[in-house]
Amino acid sequence: MIGVFGAGIVGTKVVETLVVDLQTEILVHDPNKTTANRLASRLGEKHRVVSVARKSDLNAASIVVLAGPPPHATIAREFIEKNISVVSVSDDVSDCTNLLALDSLAKNHGVTLVVGAASSPGMSGLLARSMSKSFDAVDEVHIALHGTGGPACARQHHRALSGQSVGWHEGEWIR
């Protein structure tokens, strides 16, 4: 069983992707019950594995995808302490830092914690890493994305543009 916390544009895309490839039950929780109900009823007609859940119902999942706006660290800690693996799509620098600090907790509980599983960080880093193998050396990588996930993603993008960025350079994080 997989839980998805957040039924906005990003959470919807996560659920739509999961129902195509998996036949496991998917529990959808969103603080806005109307949003969760809309997603479950739209996908539930074709894929009977999608249902609306209370937050506490997600405790029955083996993995929870945190697809709502940040912060995710507190919610992730709750699930990890219940031996539930977590995938976070947060791209907020302080939230990602707090999530990464949960690594030893996740290991101690025998679960997986995936941080930054969105476009950037996430896919952009995986693509850069994969493509860098084709070159002798890579000095810089610039990523351009088209579109946005939704209103919460747009707000986070604007906050990110007005602040400091974090980069990985020669084996260490720099600001």
Give short role names for the model-derived ranges.
Residues L18-V19, F79:
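Aromatic pocket-lining residues of Rossmann-like dinucleotide-binding sites
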Residues S90-L113:
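Rossmann-fold NAD(P)-binding glycine/threonine-rich loop
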Residues F5, K133-R175:
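Active-site-lining helix/loop region of Rossmann-like oxidoreductase modules
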Residues G11-T12:
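N-terminal Rossmann-fold NAD(P) dinucleotide-binding loop
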Residues S62-G68, V86-V87:
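N-terminal Rossmann-like NAD(P) cofactor-binding module of classical short-chain dehydrogenase/reductase
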Residues R48-N59:
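Short acidic low-complexity segments
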Residues P71-V89:
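Rossmann-fold NAD(P) dinucleotide-binding segment
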Residues T24-A40:
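NAD(P)-binding Rossmann-fold cofactor-contacting core
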